[in-house]
Amino acid sequence: MLEGIVRESTGKKATKALRRDGYLIANIYGKDFPNIHAAFKKGDFIRTVRHKEKLAFPVKVGDKELEVVVQEYQKDPVTYDLLHVDLMVAQPGVVTYYMVPIKTVGTPIGLKNKGVLVTSKRRIKVKGAIENIPDSITLDVSNLDVGDAILIRDIELPEGVEHMTAPHVAVVGVVKAK
Protein backbone atom coordinates (compact mmCIF):
# COMPACT_ATOMS: atom_id res chain seq x y z
CA MET A 1 0.00 0.00 0.00
CA LEU A 2 1.27 3.45 -0.93
CA GLU A 3 1.79 5.65 2.11
CA GLY A 4 1.82 9.44 2.07
CA ILE A 5 1.85 12.40 4.39
CA VAL A 6 -0.74 15.12 4.93
CA ARG A 7 0.60 18.57 4.03
CA GLU A 8 -0.11 21.18 6.68
CA SER A 9 1.21 24.09 4.62
CA THR A 10 0.08 24.39 1.00
CA GLY A 11 2.17 27.43 0.07
CA LYS A 12 4.82 27.76 -2.61
CA LYS A 13 7.76 27.60 -0.19
CA ALA A 14 6.56 24.41 1.52
CA THR A 15 5.75 22.79 -1.84
CA LYS A 16 9.24 23.50 -3.20
CA ALA A 17 10.81 22.10 -0.02
CA LEU A 18 8.81 18.86 -0.35
CA ARG A 19 9.74 18.50 -4.03
CA ARG A 20 13.39 19.04 -3.16
CA ASP A 21 13.11 16.19 -0.63
CA GLY A 22 11.76 13.83 -3.32
CA TYR A 23 8.04 14.14 -2.69
CA LEU A 24 5.24 14.33 -5.23
CA ILE A 25 2.48 16.81 -4.40
CA ALA A 26 -1.06 15.37 -4.57
CA ASN A 27 -4.64 16.46 -4.03
CA ILE A 28 -7.16 13.82 -3.00
CA TYR A 29 -10.82 14.65 -3.51
CA GLY A 30 -14.23 13.11 -4.11
CA LYS A 31 -17.94 13.80 -4.09
CA ASP A 32 -19.06 14.85 -0.58
CA PHE A 33 -15.49 14.19 0.58
CA PRO A 34 -13.18 16.81 2.12
CA ASN A 35 -10.07 17.63 0.07
CA ILE A 36 -6.82 16.23 1.40
CA HIS A 37 -3.53 17.93 0.51
CA ALA A 38 -0.99 15.11 0.52
CA ALA A 39 2.53 14.23 -0.59
CA PHE A 40 3.98 10.86 -1.62
CA LYS A 41 7.56 9.73 -2.22
CA LYS A 42 7.91 10.13 -6.00
CA GLY A 43 9.63 6.78 -6.62
CA ASP A 44 7.10 4.84 -4.54
CA PHE A 45 4.18 6.53 -6.31
CA ILE A 46 5.50 5.83 -9.82
CA ARG A 47 6.28 2.21 -8.92
CA THR A 48 2.78 1.71 -7.47
CA VAL A 49 1.00 3.23 -10.48
CA ARG A 50 3.06 1.28 -13.02
CA HIS A 51 2.50 -2.08 -11.32
CA LYS A 52 -1.14 -1.71 -10.26
CA GLU A 53 -3.52 -4.31 -11.62
CA LYS A 54 -6.77 -2.41 -11.14
CA LEU A 55 -7.87 1.10 -12.06
CA ALA A 56 -8.25 2.02 -8.37
CA PHE A 57 -5.42 1.45 -5.91
CA PRO A 58 -5.12 1.83 -2.12
CA VAL A 59 -3.28 4.69 -0.43
CA LYS A 60 -2.79 5.57 3.21
CA VAL A 61 -2.60 9.25 4.09
CA GLY A 62 -2.35 10.09 7.77
CA ASP A 63 -4.78 7.72 9.49
CA LYS A 64 -7.08 7.25 6.45
CA GLU A 65 -6.96 4.34 4.02
CA LEU A 66 -8.56 5.18 0.66
CA GLU A 67 -9.10 3.61 -2.75
CA VAL A 68 -8.12 6.26 -5.32
CA VAL A 69 -7.92 6.69 -9.10
CA VAL A 70 -5.40 8.93 -10.90
CA GLN A 71 -7.56 11.63 -12.45
CA GLU A 72 -4.94 14.05 -13.78
CA TYR A 73 -1.23 14.71 -13.52
CA GLN A 74 1.12 17.57 -14.34
CA LYS A 75 4.64 17.21 -15.75
CA ASP A 76 7.49 19.67 -16.03
CA PRO A 77 7.59 20.90 -19.66
CA VAL A 78 11.39 20.65 -19.92
CA THR A 79 12.45 17.67 -17.78
CA TYR A 80 9.14 15.73 -17.92
CA ASP A 81 9.39 15.14 -14.17
CA LEU A 82 6.10 14.48 -12.45
CA LEU A 83 5.15 17.64 -10.50
CA HIS A 84 1.60 17.16 -9.28
CA VAL A 85 -1.16 14.54 -9.33
CA ASP A 86 -4.90 14.69 -8.70
CA LEU A 87 -6.35 11.56 -7.09
CA MET A 88 -10.10 10.97 -6.92
CA VAL A 89 -11.56 8.75 -4.21
CA ALA A 90 -13.29 5.74 -5.82
CA GLN A 91 -16.63 5.73 -4.01
CA PRO A 92 -18.88 2.72 -4.76
CA GLY A 93 -22.21 3.66 -6.32
CA VAL A 94 -21.16 7.20 -7.27
CA VAL A 95 -21.39 7.79 -11.04
CA THR A 96 -18.50 9.92 -12.31
CA TYR A 97 -15.94 10.18 -15.11
CA TYR A 98 -12.85 7.97 -15.39
CA MET A 99 -9.98 7.66 -17.87
CA VAL A 100 -9.60 3.96 -18.78
CA PRO A 101 -6.32 2.79 -20.40
CA ILE A 102 -6.33 1.13 -23.83
CA LYS A 103 -4.22 -2.00 -24.47
CA THR A 104 -3.66 -3.58 -27.88
CA VAL A 105 -3.04 -7.26 -28.62
CA GLY A 106 -2.03 -8.96 -31.84
CA THR A 107 -0.01 -7.93 -34.88
CA PRO A 108 -1.94 -6.08 -37.60
CA ILE A 109 -1.85 -7.64 -41.08
CA GLY A 110 -1.25 -4.12 -42.41
CA LEU A 111 2.30 -4.19 -41.03
CA LYS A 112 3.24 -6.67 -43.78
CA ASN A 113 1.85 -4.20 -46.36
CA LYS A 114 4.22 -1.40 -45.26
CA GLY A 115 1.84 0.00 -42.68
CA VAL A 116 2.46 1.39 -39.19
CA LEU A 117 0.22 0.92 -36.14
CA VAL A 118 -0.75 4.33 -34.74
CA THR A 119 -2.32 4.65 -31.30
CA SER A 120 -4.31 7.90 -31.20
CA LYS A 121 -5.78 7.50 -27.72
CA ARG A 122 -3.96 5.78 -24.86
CA ARG A 123 -6.88 6.39 -22.49
CA ILE A 124 -10.56 7.04 -23.15
CA LYS A 125 -13.04 8.90 -20.99
CA VAL A 126 -16.00 6.88 -19.69
CA LYS A 127 -18.81 7.55 -17.24
CA GLY A 128 -20.09 5.09 -14.65
CA ALA A 129 -19.78 3.76 -11.11
CA ILE A 130 -16.34 2.41 -10.13
CA GLU A 131 -17.63 -1.14 -9.67
CA ASN A 132 -18.74 -1.22 -13.36
CA ILE A 133 -15.66 0.43 -14.87
CA PRO A 134 -13.20 -2.02 -16.51
CA ASP A 135 -9.56 -1.87 -15.34
CA SER A 136 -8.45 -1.56 -18.97
CA ILE A 137 -9.89 -2.02 -22.46
CA THR A 138 -8.14 -4.60 -24.64
CA LEU A 139 -8.41 -4.18 -28.42
CA ASP A 140 -7.51 -6.93 -30.91
CA VAL A 141 -5.69 -5.23 -33.80
CA SER A 142 -4.75 -8.39 -35.73
CA ASN A 143 -7.44 -7.81 -38.42
CA LEU A 144 -6.43 -4.21 -39.22
CA ASP A 145 -5.03 -3.55 -42.70
CA VAL A 146 -3.61 -0.29 -44.09
CA GLY A 147 -6.30 2.39 -43.81
CA ASP A 148 -8.35 0.54 -41.17
CA ALA A 149 -9.03 1.93 -37.70
CA ILE A 150 -10.93 1.06 -34.53
CA LEU A 151 -13.28 3.88 -33.55
CA ILE A 152 -14.83 4.71 -30.18
CA ARG A 153 -18.20 3.36 -31.39
CA ASP A 154 -16.57 -0.04 -32.11
CA ILE A 155 -15.56 -0.50 -28.46
CA GLU A 156 -18.02 -2.47 -26.33
CA LEU A 157 -18.33 -1.43 -22.70
CA PRO A 158 -19.98 -3.22 -19.76
CA GLU A 159 -23.54 -2.37 -18.76
CA GLY A 160 -23.81 0.85 -16.77
CA VAL A 161 -20.75 2.39 -18.46
CA GLU A 162 -20.94 4.84 -21.36
CA HIS A 163 -18.44 6.59 -23.65
CA MET A 164 -17.83 10.30 -23.13
CA THR A 165 -15.74 10.72 -26.29
CA ALA A 166 -17.30 11.39 -29.72
CA PRO A 167 -18.18 8.07 -31.44
CA HIS A 168 -16.29 8.90 -34.68
CA VAL A 169 -12.89 9.36 -32.97
CA ALA A 170 -10.21 6.79 -33.91
CA VAL A 171 -8.46 4.95 -31.08
CA VAL A 172 -5.95 2.85 -33.06
CA GLY A 173 -5.35 2.48 -36.77
CA VAL A 174 -2.88 1.34 -39.41
CA VAL A 175 -1.54 3.99 -41.77
CA LYS A 176 0.78 3.72 -44.77
CA ALA A 177 4.43 4.29 -43.86
CA LYS A 178 6.12 7.13 -45.70
UniProtKB/Swiss-Prot annotation:
InterPro entries: Rbsml_bL25/Gln-tRNA_synth_N (IPR020056), Ribosomal_bL25/Gln-tRNA_synth (IPR011035), Ribosomal_bL25_b-dom (IPR020057), Ribosomal_bL25_C (IPR037121), Ribosomal_bL25_long (IPR001021), Ribosomal_L25_dom (IPR029751), Ribosomal_uL5_bac-type (IPR020930)
Recorded superkingdom: Bacteria
Protein name, per record: Large ribosomal subunit protein bL25
Subunit structure as annotated in this protein's UniProt entry: Part of the 50S ribosomal subunit; part of the 5S rRNA/L5/L18/L25 subcomplex. Contacts the 5S rRNA. Binds to the 5S rRNA independently of L5 and L18.
Family of this protein: Belongs to the bacterial ribosomal protein bL25 family. CTC subfamily.
Coiled coil: none
A GO term from the CC aspect: cytosolic large ribosomal subunit
Organism: Nitratiruptor sp. (strain SB155-2)
GO molecular function terms attached to this record: 5S rRNA binding; structural constituent of ribosome
Presence of keyword rRNA-binding: yes
Gene Ontology terms: biological process: translation
Function field: This is one of the proteins that binds to the 5S RNA in the ribosome where it forms part of the central protuberance.
Gene name of the encoded protein: rplY
Entry keyword set: Ribonucleoprotein, Ribosomal protein, RNA-binding, rRNA-binding
